[in-house]
Amino acid sequence: KIDFLHMNFYIIPTPIGNLNDLTKRAKITIEKLDILIVESKQKSRILLEKINVKDKKIMIYNDSSSANNRKGILDILKAGKVCGLVSDAGTPLLSDPGFKLIRYLIDNYVNVVPLPGPTSITTGLIASGLPTDKFQFLGFFPKTAKDKASFYSELNRKNITSIFFESSHRIQKTLEDIFLNYPNSELVVAKELTKIHEKFLRGKPEKILNEFKLDKNLSSGEFVILFYKDDAVEDFSKADLLFNLLRNKLPIKEIAKLSEKLFKNNKNKTYKRYLSFSKRN
């Protein structure tokens, strides 16, 4: 029996590919809610139809939602209605909309109730074969040179598994970037987790990149990338920050020379690394 108290707000994970991963508690909670707050109506209606939940009132909350939308949800809770949040797939707030809403509700004394459930982040991690004692989630692999430099500063943390997402149309370019900058790292690409065509590719970046080049069908689907580098791998974190500071002031070659002088990084490797930042703005 679930006790629905006044001013409770539920965070409800949904399957990332296999409907059987929806928990019994999640289904019961969805059934009992007065209003289900969703990222997109179309995808959530498909889920509701599959789990045989009919006539459920739905509200949209996504990246375009405003402070007025958050206030509207709080007003509904104050009126005694019970609400819960789902994303299109997986656990809400993990690379999905919702942080501002949850923070706002907490600040207004709403009891936020998290339900455990599916997420591609830990699903990929536990089957990766990479260390699980320390890990970080970095969202999506960045597109711009400036954002890549900051992202690589995070990847340069030693002895920690980094987890991030990539889309089908950018996966090969991202693997090329990783191979160029971290050829000795350990890499796992998890494709279509929990779905029929689930697949794990494990090894050095060059090996995995070659597999994608040989089989174009690999590039379709959704990807979780898991990355690990140990103490023996050259640290470019300070060089990346230097590039971020000087990229609009000095030629790339000059920044690479300065990096070698300041941080003892190999000048040629640093130069190639900076080129990869610049050519994929």
Per-range role (PLM):
Residues 4-62:
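Glycine-rich, flexible N-terminal cofactor/catalytic loop recognition
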Residues 30-36, 109-113, 161-162:
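Short active-site oxyanion
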Residues 61-66, 141-142:
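Conserved helicase motor
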Residues 65-73:
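Glycine-rich, highly charged phosphate/nucleotide-binding loops
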Residues 82, 161, 165-281:
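A contiguous loop/helix-start segment that scaffolds small-molecule binding in enzyme catalytic cores
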Residues 100-158:
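Class I SAM-dependent methyltransferase SAM-binding "motif I" and its flanking Rossmann-like core
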